[in-house]
Curated annotation (Swiss-Prot):
This is Probable chemoreceptor glutamine deamidase CheD. GO terms for molecular function: protein-glutamine glutaminase activity. The keyword Iron does not apply. The keyword Hydrolase applies. Residues 189-223 are annotated as: Disordered.
Length: 223
């Protein structure tokens, strides 16, 4: 099972549009910045990203999860692909970096149905509903949200001041990024299907009854 350190985003680059250092968060990853002048970016399809910060401490971060919750009894549910685990990891890492729980505030994005053939799965809708319910339960106010619909999104989050730049991606203008979001949704569908498929059990038929060779009664000797 991957550790939290393994799930921390490591793809740093310089964003020429915003003229600042940036880090790209992929599905099942997170990133936390404490006082850094950095942009945290991601591309979302049916996945959801929660951007959470403590404005007083200047500590903020983002996660990117594929599904709301796993089977609590399964070790595989404790991975960043599931929202329940991804939210816990992000909040705990923020607190470790100096944030105070009572000052946390959130902005949430994603949950789109970017592939019409998969809209019946409602993965994006389930993710969106999950993140809002989770934050409400934890008492973390949601200051902004852009959830649902049929668009892929590119998110740029500036944890130092809380700004978020959202671009809805039109397929004919942003083919590469929309393709990423579509692949993400296919992966989420596959993971969801596997999570709800019961383990296959090989059934053994009852052992065949042993065959006995029956001996006929010896015939009576005749004189």
């Amino acid at each position: 099972m991957p550790s939290r350190l393994d799930a921390r985003a490591t793809r740093h680059y310089f964003d020429s549009a915003f003229h600042c250092p940036a880090v790209k968060v992929l599905p099942n990853e997170y990133y936390v910045a404490a006082g850094e002048d950095i942009m945290i970016s991601t591309v979302l399809g049916s996945c959801v990203a929660a951007c959470i910060r403590d404005p007083r401490a200047g500590v903020g971060g983002m996660n990117h999860f594929m599904l709301p919750e796993g089977d609590g009894d399964s070790p595989s549910s404790a991975t960043m692909r599931y929202g329940a685990f991804a939210m816990e990891v992000l909040i705990n890492e923020l607190l470790k970096a100096g944030a105070a729980r009572e000052r946390l505030e959130a902005k949430v994005f994603g949950g789109g149905a970017v592939l019409s053939a998969m809209q019946q799965m409602n993965i994006g809708e389930r993710n969106a509903r999950f993140v809002l319910n989770y934050l409400n339960t934890e008492g973390i106010p949601v200051l902004a949200q852009d959830l649902g619909d049929v668009h892929a999104r590119r998110i740029g989050y500036f944890p130092r001041d809380g700004r978020v730049m959202v671009r809805r991606l039109a397929p004919h203008h942003h083919k590469a990024e929309v393709l990423i979001a579509q692949r993400e949704q296919v992966a989420a569908q596959t993971a969801s299907a596997k999570a709800h498929t019961p383990p296959q059990i090989e059934r053994f038929s009852a052992p065949a009854k042993p065959r006995f060779e029956r001996f006929t009664r010896p015939s009576t000797a005749t004189s």
